């Protein structure tokens, strides 16, 4: 059994939404297929993966460095001890051959696209959903339906006919009960009016989260924290620069409520530094590292080891992303909850119709692999990739 081809395709995100820092209208995602010599039903078995949402496609790194390394590797060196499956850890090591340590940026997403395609491939070879493959690999029992909340809460210009209240009411009608909204793209007073508008739909602070997308300096962060503190929100997310651990710790001390961060940290050592210096509290704060931006599920499991070795519960891990791959990761690894982007960040955001949302909980379908083929918004890109 061997890999015969690796294909990649840059797929643009649809919708043109923006947060306080980034406009996503120019963003792309790398969709990858790892094709094998195994033939079933007249077609070669291929694993699909992508590098999550928010960091651009990485075609250059994939084509120039990682795909050639993988195709040059001895086929047996990529297999597990039994020889019947691919070893994602061995694949990742090959992808990173001769890469210097540190600098965990775009290459982390490039590697993740391929590494996660290996998990999809192994699950298809076993004819089982990816969450079962993931759970077995790490000695876990898959969880049942997991809590799901909506990312969203964008800014709407007056006169557009759309409001934040309308957006969140739509999500509630779809079965969601907890909602996340953007802040930092308007003055504090205006943002607080938006928060009150969102609370009218959410019902209480423990069903509402706010996300500053790393925009705030310490002074602004503390001003927001003072206004938000009485509302007892579920969490205050990405307050300042992701690598400003001191700011994170100082806001935590002043704010008292739960904070969430980590989506822009891409390695186990970055996670360790957050734990050491960021003021994060066991049983209280939320870690949002995203496997698709962080070298894949292999490195993400190392991040969880860092958390648990420092007294944190893996249920404090709620990955960024809001897509099918991370849904399987949450179920397979027994994490706290998952995000969803209903109708946003297509064709990758959100889940397939087979993933029923009921009572604010969701579970993957029983399709083999991650079930990306069941997501109709992705079907055209997958057909193009595999043609």
Question: Where are the regions a protein language model picked out?
Answer:
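Shared catalytic-loop signature of beta/alpha-barrel
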Residues: 243-366
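Short loop/turn motifs at secondary-structure junctions
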Residues: 2, 175, 229-235, 280-283, ...
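Structured beta-strand/loop patches that form or line metal/cofactor-binding pockets in enzymes
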Residues: 1-60, 65, 348
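Extended hydrophobic packing segments that form well-structured cores
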Residues: 4, 368-387
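Metal- or metallocofactor-binding catalytic centers and their adjacent structured scaffolds
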Residues: 39-126
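General beta-strand structural signal in soluble alpha/beta enzymes
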Residues: 49, 132-133, 150, 208-210, ...
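Metal-dependent enolase-superfamily TIM-barrel catalytic cores that perform enediolate-based chemistry
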Residues: 133-255
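Conserved, mostly hydrophobic/aromatic
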Residues: 32, 44, 114, 127, ...
